[in-house]
Amino acid sequence: MLRHIAPLIFVMITLLIARQIYPYSSFNTPTVDDGFEIEVVATNLGGPTCLDWFNESTLIVCDRDGGQIYTLDANMRKTVLISDLDRPHDMAYTETSIFVSEAGELTRYTHNGNLEQIENRTTLVSGVPTGNHQTNAINILPNGTLIWHSGSTCNICVEDDSRNGALLWVNASTGSHGILASGVRNSFDGVWVPNVGYVFTDNGRDWEGDHPDEELNLLAEGGNYGWPDDDPSNPVPAGSIGPIATWTPHTSMNGVALRPANSPLPGGNTTVYATVYGSWNTILPQGHEIVRIDLSPTNGDVIGVTSVFAEDVGTPLPIVFHPNGDLYFAVFGSNGKLYKITAEI
């Protein structure tokens, strides 16, 4: 009997290992909705965690694993802007300043308006603890205040530092900062949506079966979004704010981008697209998608409807629309690949 069971166990273990490896390999075959096409436009990006079009021919890339921020030109030639960074997750810029989110630290540089003469490194915030997660996106609100996403140090715990598991406001000039929203376990990114507000992704706890859903939330100043008290029996604790859109549990919804009016991709002026990285915390593969979320303000509330737009895309993290409306995203596995989605001609 045992000699018959042993091969079966071996096959099952092999399949489980293959399932874990597959999304990080180069063997996936991305598919996208009818009427659109997807293609790889650059490889060997490193560990890409941010994408931002500086202009129509200059793409900014954060390489977390390489500790650098660089640009790609129209021919995908690389120019390093800033190096020797500690796991840079994101950057934001104005006409005179560049803000960089590193592990537990937010820094500012000056530049000449064209991403040249980058100098005068200044530490705005430091000492934010890192652990299971780290500080992620840095964005600029319409009023000029910086919003900095700070992940939790654990899966489920009460943080010693209130700056973990939170969204922070930061004064871009002085570095003074505080808690803008709490109870946010690990928010990778957010985006301002006109007529809606600032929306942000959040990755929920692991090891709780089909709880909780991946979330898209609407920022309310001073709001609490439930973690770590949001257990399966009480998913939206009293006094906390529930999500405006959800997706498959444990699939890690991360980067988010607002669809521009000139985009050929489906949606309206309050549609966002998000990356779904996928998870090791499931038996069968889930995630590895690009999803579309249509936001509809109704009677003072905002409701989001989520649907799949692209599948089997590997491990996508950052996402951005080109000025011409095409959609770009990068996968973190396979040493970093850049994809473009556009309408079929």
Feature annotation, model-predicted:
Residues 37-43, 77-83, 122-128, 175-181, ...:
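A short beta-strand motif characteristic of beta-propeller blades
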Residues 104-141, 149-152:
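Asp-box/WD-like beta-propeller blade repeats and closely related beta-sheet repeat scaffolds
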Residues 21-32, 135, 152-157, 162-179, ...:
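Beta-propeller domain segments
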Residues 1-23:
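Secretory targeting signatures
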